[in-house]
């Protein structure tokens, strides 16, 4: 099998608004579930962190290199026999300006898979836990990742930081990614769906673009003795493909209207994939 390159991946996204794993870029058989498969997939996701930590002290880390490191999440899935299916970015391409992306949050996969995907359409910033930016050697690397750290200690301070920094980044030409559920959830629930993204979009005067992901291939670990130390790395199920769908560009308006329009599209799309939704 040949390995998909980041350049080919992003070129296909820009040309067609989507991507689907090519037959000759995927293992002929899906890997059997088990500890080795879980280890291989988890390494494909997490290697971005030691790689960034290694090159940053030498001043070699760039946004393009960060995207290349993150791209191993896609090639890693394909080497295990899974398909990566991305669709719906044509409207986003046609718009051409910075947008506010809102995405559901199921697992660690989308936090690594989305950067090389969204960078195909221009620079973007995103919200992440402050603890991630403070990992050894990663504090400076977080600048290349355009990360906006939040502590989750004071919701009000987090809100003000997101609104202030987000508005500045969008005004400067960055798109902005927020996971409105805050933490990873298997069920897409209105109760957990924050309006912070819609508020930022209204303040910054930019449209909202909803995105949904299906990354059930590696769920969060809920039970067992490894739950606390390996929470993010549940057993991998290679029978489940990775899917990403981008919704319409929702013109800027009142935050309440943006909030509802994005939620409705996301809920409807997830239901069409037979994923659980609580309206």
Task: Briefly describe each language-model feature range.
Residues 1-99, 112-113:
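Membrane-anchoring hydrophobic helices of lipid-metabolizing enzymes
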Residues 138-139, 175, 186-256:
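A cross-family acyltransferase "interaction/gating" segment
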Residues 98-100, 173-179:
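Residue-level preference for the first positions of well-ordered beta-strands
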